[in-house]
C-alpha cells in the first residue's frame, strides 16, 4: 500500500488563481468543489515540531461527504520533501475527539477552507481559499514513477517556478498569518 505523498504548495494571488482556472478548463478536468474544516491536534507527551516547524500532525477533516482522521509525518530532510500519510474514515468526530483528548491530545488550530480540485495528466491539484490566510495551490504527483519536473513544467505555464514553492505546512503558514 502506497502512503507516500509528493506534493508542492504555492501561495498564489487572485490573478494566478483566475489564470489557472481559465487554463485548466481547457486542459484538464474539475473533479469537485468542497468546504473543508480541518481540526489539528497536538499531544502533551510528544513534540510534533522541530524548531517551530510542524513535522507530524493529527488532523480530523470534516467535509460534506464525511469525517476523516489523518496522520502525517513530514520528511523535510528529503528532496523533494514528502510525507507519509495515513487516513481512515471515522463515523463520529465527537467520539474521535474524545479518544484523542483521552490520549492527551488538545486542539491546536482549526482551518476553514474552500477547495476546488482538478486533474491534469499525472497531476492532481487543489486551489484553496483559506480563511485568515488567502489563496494556496497544492500540486500532487499521482504517478509514483513520475518526476517532480512534471509539476514544475505545469506551474511554469502560470509564471511559477521552484523558487515559488513554500515548504511550510498549512499549520505553520496559519500561525505566521495569525501573528502578523
Which role fits each region the language model picked out?
Residues 13, 142-144:
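Short beta->alpha junction loops/turns
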Residues 1-122, 160-180:
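N-terminal strand-loop-strand beta-hairpin
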Residues 144-169:
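Mixed-charge, glycine-accented linear interaction segment located at domain edges/termini
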Residues 76-79, 134-136, 146:
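A short local loop/turn or secondary-structure capping micro-motif enriched for an aromatic residue
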Residues 124-130, 135-136:
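Strongly charged, low-complexity linkers/loops
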Amino acid at each position: 500500500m502506497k502512503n507516500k505523498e509528493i506534493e508542492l504548495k504555492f501561495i498564489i494571488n487572485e490573478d494566478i488563481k483566475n489564470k489557472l482556472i481559465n487554463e485548466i478548463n481547457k486542459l484538464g478536468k474539475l473533479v469537485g468543489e468542497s468546504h473543508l474544516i480541518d481540526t489539528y491536534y497536538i499531544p502533551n507527551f510528544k513534540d510534533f515540531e522541530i524548531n517551530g516547524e510542524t513535522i507530524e500532525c493529527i488532523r480530523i477533516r470534516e467535509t460534506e461527504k464525511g469525517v476523516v482522521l489523518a496522520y502525517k509525518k513530514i520528511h523535510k530532510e528529503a528532496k523533494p520533501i514528502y510525507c507519509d500519510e495515513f487516513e481512515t474514515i471515522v463515523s463520529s468526530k465527537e467520539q474521535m475527539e474524545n479518544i484523542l483528548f483521552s490520549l492527551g491530545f488538545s486542539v491546536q488550530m482549526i482551518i476553514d477552507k474552500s477547495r476546488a480540485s482538478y486533474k491534469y495528466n499525472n497531476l492532481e491539484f487543489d486551489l484553496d481559499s483559506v480563511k485568515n490566510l488567502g489563496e494556496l495551490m497544492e500540486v500532487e504527483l499521482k504517478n509514483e514513477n513520475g518526476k517532480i519536473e512534471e509539476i514544475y513544467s505545469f506551474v511554469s505555464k502560470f509564471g511559477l517556478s521552484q523558487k515559488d514553492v513554500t515548504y511550510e505546512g498549512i499549520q505553520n503558514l496559519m500561525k505566521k498569518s495569525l501573528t502578523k
